[in-house]
Amino acid sequence: YTTLFRSHRKAINDASLVIWLGKAHEAPLNKLLSNNKKAIALLDSGILSILPQRNTRGAALPNTVDTHVWLEPNNAVRIGFFIAALRSQQHPENKAKYWNNANTFARNMLQAAQAYDSSSNGKPYWSYHDAYQYLERSLNLKFAGALTDDPHVAPTAAQIKYLNDSRPKAQMCLLAESFTTKGQYQKLGSITFQPVDESMNNEDNFVTAWKKLAIKTDKCVLNTQK
């Protein structure tokens, strides 16, 4: 949830360019930004590869958007070039610098993603809620279900039973927010619990943050392949 202080509002009003995901991901910002000509919503830009949300059993939900788009390396690269293009329009004198920065970011981002083998069969995993779909192509993951469709709502007994009855491996990797408690997943039996932060809070370098998330996720699923 987004809390806006007066200082945030002033910074937004003073900014020459505001990049945000859009109403679907940051609804509290919509009133402030939707009519701001300097604000660009990435989800409405047409530059991203966007996937639908899935239910807790992996079925795509029609007319929905999974907003965790930044986890897909190709999307991250597109965002970098998009920002470079926008800033170049505003400051043509700095165009070469902006595009050089975008190219460097793209090279580093794609190198990080190419470190993982995507040729073998997808490695199954569970999540507390479905937030990692955009990592699956790069890390060769296969979604086998989620405990809940809302991280703030406890899983039902029926869903826990479904996961246990349909588990593809005896030992499963569970990706979850750090605030998830053992009581919420202990009935899943043999699992490797991996706390992850898909929002990358408290990180100041995107490629480094993506690498950290990828390493944790990959290690978790590989531990269940043995």
Q: For the regions a protein language model found, what residue spans apply to each?
A:
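Extracytoplasmic metal-acquisition and chelation regions
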Residues: 2-226
